[in-house]
Amino acid sequence: NVGRVLNYLDENGLTENTIVIYSSDQGFYLGEHGWYDKRWMYEESLRMPFLIRWPEKIAPGTRHEQLIQNIDYAPTFLEAAGIERPNGIQGKSMVSLYEKPNSQNWRKYVYYHYYEHLTEHGVPRHDGVRGERYKLINFYSNDGWSLYDLETDPDELKDLSKLPEYKDTLIH
C-alpha cells in the first residue's frame, strides 16, 4: 500500500510538496535471541525503520547510519514544515543529516529504558546506552551488566562485561 500512495502522489503532481515517512515505534524479534516480541535492548528491538521520501532534500537511495530516536521526529517535522520549535521539546532535527550527510555534529549515543519488571514476558528492568560500536546494558533490578561490541559481534551473542580487557570500555 505504500507503493500505491507513492504512485498516487506521483500521478497527481504532489510528490514535490509531500514528505512521506515510513517508520515504527520499535523493532521486533522474529525468533532472534529466542524472542517473538520486543522489550529487550538488542538491536532487533532497538532498531526501527525510518524511510523517508523528500525529493527536495534527499536523493533516492541515500542511506544514513547515524543514531536517531523517535524523540527526533517532532523537531524534524517542525523544521521541515518551517514551524518554530517550542522550548522544552526533546530530540534533534534530522534535517541537518540530509543537508550534510557526513556531519560529525550528531549524537554519538542513544539511551534506552525498559521499566516494567517480569511481566507476562519475563523481561527484567533494564536500561542502557548504545554507541556507534559498543552497547552497555544495565539490569538494575539485580545489578547485572552486559556489554557488546557491535562491530565484531553484530548479533550480540558474546557478553564482554566480565572480561578484564573491556574494563575501560565499561568506564567510558
Language-model segments: which ranges?
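Active-site rim elements
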Residues: 57-68, 80-85, 156-166
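Beta-strand elements within well-structured catalytic alpha/beta cores of enzymes
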Residues: 2, 19-24, 50-52, 73-78, ...
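Histidine-centered active-site microenvironments of extracellular/periplasmic hydrolases
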Residues: 7-62, 69, 90
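C-terminal cap/loop subdomain of S1 sulfatases and analogous C-terminal strand-loop tails that border
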Residues: 26-32, 71-74, 79-150, 155, ...
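Secondary-structure boundary motif
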Residues: 11, 100-103, 162
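Well-ordered alpha-helical scaffold segments within catalytic/enzyme domains
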Residues: 1-9, 80-81
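Generic alpha-helical structural signal
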Residues: 3, 171-172
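Short alpha-helix within the catalytic core of nucleotide-sugar-dependent glycosyltransferases
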Residues: 3, 35, 99
